[in-house]
């Protein structure tokens, strides 16, 4: 075993003792980041090239600073995104939301589907859809100026129409024209604050995490926004907490102009997102 792999083994134990959920992966990611190699190439780093700063970044992760803040990058589907303080770090669970959205858009057989991403954050969802649905017209909105600093970096050179504003009033010029509305909004109940992982609670912006006493305040508002934006037959996809699968689909009721409301699991088989179709006239 070379020196770097031995140090990674020690770092793994330290991170595990600190309660980090994925200690081995994070120890390897930090080593790869600092030494400019891929995780699978750590064994190729000569002992003489070991960077003593490794223990500095391990200490930061040990203190539960997000891995993505330390490395400045987050991976989402086929994207590498720039992230840091002020913007929500995209989660693997949201990849299931995007996968379902892509399948839904392709099934529509629309030549240039119009897609809106509400609460875009880093831009992960919007950019993934623009990349994987090549002829789509993708629009995204974000309220926070701090988050937008990162969004603009990630979207530089892309064809996504990015705007700053409130998701509830966004894109009046697209009313009734949108094929798909997608959102990963804040949905954590304020009462759950103390149970949120330190990486999120202490580092993600509160605006991107919490939404009222039951966590559903913004989703209730987005239901009306989605209905306003969508064409008849258009689809909405909204992420939620794994404890809200029995509640969110009921926000999209027939009485409010929806059909086919349903809930869907993520790759870990936990309730993760709700979908509904705007009813035909």
From Swiss-Prot:
Domain of life: Bacteria
Transferase in keyword set: yes
Keyword Methyltransferase: yes
Ranges where the record places region Disordered: 261-281
InterPro entries the record matches: DNA_methylase_N6_adenine_CS (IPR002052), HemK-like (IPR004556), Methyltransf_25 (IPR041698), N5-glutamine_MTase (IPR050320), PrmC_N (IPR040758), RF_methyltr_PrmC (IPR019874), SAM-dependent_MTases_sf (IPR029063)
Binding site for S-adenosyl-L-methionine: 142, 184
Keywords, ordered alphabetically: Methyltransferase, S-adenosyl-L-methionine, Transferase
EC number: 2.1.1.297
GO MF annotations in UniProt: nucleic acid binding; protein-(glutamine-N5) methyltransferase activity; protein-glutamine N-methyltransferase activity
Pfam families per UniProt: Methyltransf_25 (PF13649), PrmC_N (PF17827)
Catalytic activity: L-glutaminyl-[peptide chain release factor] + S-adenosyl-L-methionine = N(5)-methyl-L-glutaminyl-[peptide chain release factor] + S-adenosyl-L-homocysteine + H(+)
Residues engaged in binding substrate: 184-187
One GO-annotated biological process of the protein: methylation
Annotated function: Methylates the class 1 translation termination release factors RF1/PrfA and RF2/PrfB on the glutamine residue of the universally conserved GGQ motif.
Family recorded in the similarity comment: Belongs to the protein N5-glutamine methyltransferase family. PrmC subfamily.
Name of the protein: Release factor glutamine methyltransferase
């Amino acid at each position: 075993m070379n020196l770097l792999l031995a140090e990674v083994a020690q770092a793994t134990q330290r991170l595990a003792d600190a309660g980090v959920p994925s200690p081995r992966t994070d120890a390897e990611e930090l080593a790869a980041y600092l030494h400019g190699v891929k995780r699978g190439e750590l064994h190729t780093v000569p002992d003489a090239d070991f960077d003593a700063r490794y223990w500095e970044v391990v200490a930061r992760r040990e203190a539960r600073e997000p891995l993505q803040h330390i490395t400045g990058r987050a991976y989402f589907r086929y994207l590498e995104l720039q992230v840091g303080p002020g913007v929500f770090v995209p989660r693997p669970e949201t990849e299931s939301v995007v996968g379902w959205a892509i399948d839904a858009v392709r099934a529509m057989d629309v030549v240039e589907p119009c897609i809106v991403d509400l609460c875009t954050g880093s831009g992960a969802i919007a950019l993934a859809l623009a990349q994987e649905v090549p002829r789509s017209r993708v629009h995204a909105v974000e309220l926070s100026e701090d988050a937008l600093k990162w969004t603009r970096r990630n979207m530089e050179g892309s064809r996504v129409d990015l705007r700053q504003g409130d998701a509830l009033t966004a894109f009046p010029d697209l009313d009734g024209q949108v094929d798909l509305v997608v959102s990963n909004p804040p949905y954590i109940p304020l009462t759950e604050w103390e149970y949120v992982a330190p990486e999120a609670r202490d580092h993600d912006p509160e605006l991107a995490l919490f939404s009222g006493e039951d966590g559903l305040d913004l989703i209730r508002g987005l239901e009306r926004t989605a209905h306003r934006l969508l064409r008849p037959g258009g689809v909405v996809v909204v992420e939620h907490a794994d404890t809200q699968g029995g509640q969110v689909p009921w926000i999209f009721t027939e009485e409010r102009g929806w059909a086919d409301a349903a809930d869907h699991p993520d790759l870990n088989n936990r309730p993760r997102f709700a979908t509904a179709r705007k009813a035909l006239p």
